Structure formats: structure tokens, C-alpha cells
Amino acid sequence: MFAVIRTGGKQYKVANGDVIKVEKLVADAGATVTLDDVLMVSDAGKTTIGTPVVQGAAVTAEVVAQSRGPKIIIFKKKRRQNYRRKNGHRQDLTVLRITGIQA
């Protein structure tokens, strides 16, 4: 059984036991979160596609950790003007372990 969920503006295909990194969710490590934005559920060949979400479907997950992504370097330059700007960014992420899919 798997589902397609939407969180943080992105879509993820998940199954029981999967570990995924999503955009930061406000929850402590060890907490349980419920993701209600389920776009599709498939179970033993029976597929349900939502319009836009599947009614009554939910995915439960356990928060494993709050982490940060890799550092992205932003470098701006204008030639011949001695204009250089260097900036860095690390995105806050939440690591989730999928514990259940209810269709």
C-alpha cells in the first residue's frame, strides 16, 4: 500500500516504514503528526485518486528529527564593477517515518 501526499508545496510517494525529509513542520522529535492532504491511495491494485484530495484518507508519521539541508551558496557578481555578494542558505527540514496509511 502506498499514498501520494502533499506537504510544504511538494508531493511525496510514501509507504509504511518509509523515512522522508519534508519542509519544516512544527513538532518535537518523537511526536506523531497526521498528514490529511492525501492526493492518491493505492492498495493491492485498487487505486483511488482524489479531486483534489481523497476524502477520509490520512497518513500518520512519527517525527524522527528536526534537521537542516545542505548549504546552498548564492553568489552575485557584476563584471567590471567590483560588485560581489556571497550569501549562504540552509533549509530547515523535518525527518518523518511513515507509521500508517488510512484510506
From Swiss-Prot:
Q: What does this protein do?
A: This protein binds to 23S rRNA in the presence of protein L20.
Its quaternary structure? Part of the 50S ribosomal subunit. Contacts protein L20.
Q: Which GO terms describe its molecular function?
A: rRNA binding; structural constituent of ribosome
Name the family: Belongs to the bacterial ribosomal protein bL21 family.
This one is known as Large ribosomal subunit protein bL21
Query: Which Pfam families does the protein's record reference?
Result: Ribosomal_L21p (PF00829)
Q: Name the GO terms of the biological process aspect.
A: translation
Query: Would you tell me the Gene Ontology cellular component terms?
Result: cytoplasm; ribonucleoprotein complex; ribosome
Q: Which UniProt keywords apply?
A: Ribonucleoprotein, Ribosomal protein, RNA-binding, rRNA-binding
Q: Source organism's superkingdom? A: Bacteria
Q: Which InterPro entries match?
A: bL21-like (IPR028909), bL21-like_sf (IPR036164), Ribosomal_bL21 (IPR001787)
Q: In the record, which residues are listed under signal peptide? A: none
